């Protein structure tokens, strides 16, 4: 490729709405341009990197035995109504009517369509296992699209769907996809972690997310530095921080805490650690034709409620936070001084595992400006229902028993789910088993955010000059920067020969023949992030030398002109082989 025949749309400044590094650099490097909120044009530089990501994904999916197909972006409402997600999905599902007033959606995922394919095409257990995948544009009408391709409304995704005869077979299909994802992200050159995760709106039983580690990541990841354990903070099990409950050492007493409605303020006033205070959270579950059931959840003062874990507790599916009027009705006081002792009406108490092992703790007195200290289970309160209802924190014991947890930020770029029979049951996707009986197909689904990978890779790989691409997905592997290409026959001939030799060696090379000043050339290619640069100048050629600099190198080095192509080709191959 010659730069004079390519489109290079670099900018000196990032747009005002670009908040994170990847968004700023993708615009400045001429990779993307905004069309509407969360919708982008992918310019030639950006598209080249997208195609390289897609090629790696496609190779590894094929290697894992998946079969490529292509499903429509536009899907009939009937399929979504059949699965039940027409009502469950929120406004991020873009719905519209055609000229005949038939309802359709633009697909955010394709579980319904692929299940429709399977129920019409797969009849026998002999046709399974099978795994279909596609690389296609999706649309989710995000309420606040931001961060460029990291949270866009339209994006490119690889989604795959496996169909098995039973759950044991699904586990094998799931493992193949898990391993394929590890290979994909390793080949791309990302620092990543697979983490145990919650299935969310997709449904099913087990799942893992694949996160690129980056300070700008939206997700908090709990991991153990001394083991392989990693999980989304929302899914990580929080073990009790006390091995057992100590015997009471204090008498229960009411304490004046004027104006101290927060645990931190109470602890400071009483001169005790925050860890001895209790945070009370009031939830409600509605009962048709009757008053709601009110719940009091008790957490240690320095802990936060995990809403996903809470929703999985018996009786708490579909819970909501109680209104202030309900709190006053059940506790006799507004929020800030709530506790389990002396409630106005009966409430159901759930204590976090750590709280259940505490002694001599402080709770609200259900009276404004008062708390109760020296509270103990069994003596002052009946034994509670105990559950894991909090988020883990750095320093907590790792659930695998092999150390303590640390917390980092991650950008989710892939997710694998064991769906089970959620969709096949709803949509009647059955097959005939070995005994001649109809059984629901057991499904898995597996997604990779192709365009999001670009943003995540940049968040891990940049400096003050621009992008530093992982070798495998750089738009070009090598750039040739001739000094005076249009003025010097020697420079032009040497550059053309280098270009031909590198291209013949299978290297993705671009020759900058635009006639730009050296500073402009260097700034453009450092911004775009090409991993290897060769500078050809008359002075160096007189000494038989060409200047080489890797994008990550602090200084340039000189290479013999007659072997420079071979040397750089070897550097590229070595980097790709890592």
Swiss-Prot record:
Its main location: cytoplasm. Keywords: Aminoacyl-tRNA synthetase, ATP-binding, Cytoplasm, Ligase, Nucleotide-binding, Protein biosynthesis. The keyword NAD does not apply. InterPro entries: aa-tRNA-synt_IIb, aa-tRNA-synth_II, aa-tRNA-synth_II/BPL/LPL, Anticodon-bd, Anticodon-bd_dom_sf, Pro-tRNA-ligase_IIa, Pro-tRNA-synth_IIa_bac-type, Pro-tRNA-Synthase_IIa_type1. It catalyses: tRNA(Pro) + L-proline + ATP = L-prolyl-tRNA(Pro) + AMP + diphosphate. Transmembrane segments: none annotated. GO terms for cellular component: cytosol. It is an enzyme of class 6 (ligase). The keyword Nucleotide-binding applies. One of its GO terms (biological process) is prolyl-tRNA aminoacylation. Its EC number is 6.1.1.15. Gene3D superfamilies: Anticodon-binding domain, Bira Bifunctional Protein, Domain 2, YbaK/aminoacyl-tRNA synthetase-associated domain. GO terms for molecular function: aminoacyl-tRNA deacylase activity; ATP binding; proline-tRNA ligase activity. It is found in: Cytoplasm. Pfam families: HGTP_anticodon, tRNA-synt_2b, tRNA_edit. Consists of three domains: the N-terminal catalytic domain, the editing domain and the C-terminal anticodon-binding domain. Belongs to the class-II aminoacyl-tRNA synthetase family. ProS type 1 subfamily. Homodimer. Catalyzes the attachment of proline to tRNA(Pro) in a two-step reaction: proline is first activated by ATP to form Pro-AMP and then transferred to the acceptor end of tRNA(Pro). As ProRS can inadvertently accommodate and process non-cognate amino acids such as alanine and cysteine, to avoid such errors it has two additional distinct editing activities against alanine. One activity is designated as 'pretransfer' editing and involves the tRNA(Pro)-independent hydrolysis of activated Ala-AMP. This is Proline--tRNA ligase. It comes from Burkholderia thailandensis (strain ATCC 700388 / DSM 13276 / CCUG 48851 / CIP 106301 / E264). The lineage of its organism: Bacteria, Pseudomonadati, Pseudomonadota, Betaproteobacteria, Burkholderiales.
């Amino acid at each position: 490729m010659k730069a004079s025949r390519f489109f290079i749309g670099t900018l000196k400044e990032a747009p005002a709405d670009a908040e994170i590094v990847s968004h700023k650099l993708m615009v400045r490097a001429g990779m993307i341009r905004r069309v509407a909120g969360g919708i982008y044009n992918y310019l030639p530089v950006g598209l080249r990197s997208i195609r390289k990501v897609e090629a790696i994904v496609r190779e590894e999916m094929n290697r894992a035995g998946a079969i490529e197909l292509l499903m429509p972006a536009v899907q009939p409402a009937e399929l979504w109504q059949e699965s039940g997600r027409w009502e469950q999905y929120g406004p991020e599902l873009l719905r519209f009517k055609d000229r005949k007033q038939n309802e359709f959606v633009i697909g955010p995922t394709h579980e319904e369509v692929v299940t429709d394919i399977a129920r019409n095409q797969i009849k026998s257990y002999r046709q399974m296992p099978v795994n279909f995948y596609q690389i296609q544009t999706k649309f989710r009408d995000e309420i606040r699209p931001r961060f460029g391709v990291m949270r866009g409304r339209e994006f490119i995704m690889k989604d795959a769907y496996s169909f098995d005869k039973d759950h044991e077979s699904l586990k094998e299909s799931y493992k193949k996809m898990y391993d394929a994802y590890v290979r994909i992200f390793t080949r791309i050159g990302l620092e990543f972690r697979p983490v145990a995760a919650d299935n969310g709106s997709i449904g099913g039983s087990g799942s893992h997310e694949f996160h690129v580690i980056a300070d700008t990541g939206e997700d908090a990841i709990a991991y153990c530095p001394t083991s392989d354990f990693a999980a989304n903070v929302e899914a990580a099990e929080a073990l009790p921080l006390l091995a057992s409950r100590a015997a009471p050492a204090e008498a229960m007493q009411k304490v004046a805490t004027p104006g101290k409605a927060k645990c931190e303020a109470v602890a400071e006033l009483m001169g005790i650690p925050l860890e001895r205070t209790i945070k009370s959270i009031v939830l409600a579950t509605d009962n048709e034709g009757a008053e709601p059931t009110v719940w009091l959840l008790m957490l240690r003062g320095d802990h936060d409620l995990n809403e996903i874990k809470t929703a999985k507790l018996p009786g708490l599916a579909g819970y909501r936070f109680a209104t202030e009027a309900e709190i006053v009705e059940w506790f006799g006081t507004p929020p800030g001084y709530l506790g389990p002792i002396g409630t106005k009406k009966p409430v159901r108490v759930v204590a976090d595992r750590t709280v259940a092992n505490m002694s001599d703790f402080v709770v609200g007195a259900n009276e404004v400006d008062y708390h109760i200290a020296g509270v103990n289970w069994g003596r002052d309160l009946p034994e509670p229902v105990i559950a894991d209802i909090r988020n883990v924190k750095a320093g907590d014991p790792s659930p695998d028993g092999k150390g303590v947890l640390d917390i980092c930020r991650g950008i989710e770029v892939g997710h694998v789910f064991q769906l089970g029979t959620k969709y096949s049951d709803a949509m009647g996707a059955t097959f005939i088993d070995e005994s001649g009986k109809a059984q629901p197909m057991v499904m898995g689904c597996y997604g990779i955010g192709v365009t999001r990978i670009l943003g995540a890779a940049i968040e891990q790989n940049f400096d003050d000059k621009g992008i530093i691409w992982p070798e495998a997905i750089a738009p070009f592997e090598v750039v040739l920067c001739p000094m005076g290409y249009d003025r010097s026959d020697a420079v032009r001939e040497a550059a053309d020969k280098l270009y031909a030799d590198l291209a013949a060696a299978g290297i993705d090379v671009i020759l900058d023949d635009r006639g730009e000043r050296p500073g402009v050339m260097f700034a453009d290619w450092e911004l775009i992030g090409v991993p290897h640069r060769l500078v050809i100048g008359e002075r160096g050629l007189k000494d038989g030398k060409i200047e080489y600099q890797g994008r990550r190198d602090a200084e340039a080095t000189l290479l013999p002109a007659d072997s420079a192509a071979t040397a750089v080709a070897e550097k590229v191959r070595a980097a790709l082989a890592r």
